Each structure stands twice: as C-alpha cells, then as structure tokens.
Amino acid sequence: MSELSLSYGSADVQVDKRETLFEGYFQVDALILRHRRFDGSWTEGICREIFERGDAVAVLPWHVESDSVILIEQFRPGAIRGDESPWMLEVVAGVVEPGEGDSDVAHREALEEAGCALDALLPVVSYYPSPGACSEQIRLFVGRAVSAAVGEVKGVDTEHEDILVHSVSRTDAIALLDAGKINNGLTIIALHWLARHGDRLRAEWLDP
C-alpha cells in the first residue's frame, strides 16, 4: 500500500484570537487564524466559527453467538427538517466527561442506553464528523455484548432520554444499511466496518 502523507502539520497554523460567542449546552467560538498555503505562503487573518461540544465515544454492541447487533432508536431534534421521521436507528454513543477514559464511556453508555454489558472492546476508527465547523472527534468501537435490554426503553431520566433497544441480525442490519434506512454517519460507518470485518472478528471472538 502506497503512503499518502499530508503536506502540513499543526505548526503551520497560527491562532491569533479566540472568542466565545455562545455558551449553553454547546459552545460556539470564533477564531482569527492564519495557515500556510500550498504555495508555501501564509493566508491573511481568517475568521472561522467553531462548534465546541467535546469528544464522544461510540460502540456497536454485537452478540457474536447469535450474530446480532444492538441498535437503539431515539428522537433527534436535528432531523426536524421535513424528513419522514426524526427518530433514528443508531449505535450507542456518549460524550467523554473530564477524567473518563474511552473504555469507561463505552461501558457506561452501553449500560445506560441499551442495558448492555460488554466483555470486550475493539477500536474501529477515530474521526471528525464535520471538521469544517466542529472540533468534536468521535472514537468508535465494536463491543462484544453479553446481554442487552432488548425491547425495553432505556436512557437517563435527568437527560430526558427515551431510548428503545433493538436486536437485529447482522444480515438484516446490513440490509437496512443498503436500503438507506440508516441515515446517520456514525451508524453507517460502524455497519460498513462490520460488513467488511465481521466474519474475521466473529471467528476470533468465538475461538480465542
């Protein structure tokens, strides 16, 4: 496999000013910055507004013995834009709190959102869902599920969560993906990864 390296690094950006424009459940900062151009020169000062919400950890719980994945269904206000439904099928995910490790978040959110106990975690990918406007990085895992509260409604009451837990065969989950029924990027990435690597990982987990 050939290497494709990036032209510049963090030393090639200079943030001259940062100002918080809004601070509520989320935060919006305005940055005045300069960065190196591909001809080697520097840009003039540019204003960019950045949505700050911290990092998140996500996990796709997978019961390898039955070859079924755990998906959760919940309401998402960002999808109130004329779509057929603002409820989505998703993987488990949550924000990383100060002092928490990624594994801690994965286990906590699996229990809170799906009543799901995990006995193994495998990192899949770390990525920026919208780096042109948001600083959030998501770290995605696949987890070996021991149990789950399938058919139950879970979530944290104080966070107004109302989450329905589903168990879907791996084959049916991929079929939902191919039919366009999965419409959020995190779950699309997780299921595409499972479609490519699931057979190998299932064999490893069933016969360690």
What residue spans do the PLM features occupy?
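Nudix hydrolase/Nudix homology domain
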Residues: M1-V13, K17, E73, E84-W87, ...
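Acidic, metal-coordinating catalytic segment for phosphate/diphosphate chemistry
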Residues: L21-S66, I80
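Conserved hydrophobic "DFG−1" position in protein kinase catalytic cores
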Residues: L33, P61, L71, V142-G143, ...
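Active-site-adjacent beta-strand/loop module that shapes the phosphate/pyrophosphate-binding cleft
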Residues: L33-F38, S130-G151
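Short loop segments at secondary-structure junctions
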Residues: R36-F38, H63-E65, F75, R144-A148, ...
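Conserved Nudix-box catalytic region and its N-terminal flanking loop in Nudix hydrolases
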Residues: R48-R53, L60, S68-R108, V150, ...
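Helix N-cap/coil-helix junction residues
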Residues: G115-C116, I182
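Acidic/glycine-rich phosphate/pyrophosphate-binding loops and surrounding catalytic core
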Residues: A117-L122, Y128-P129
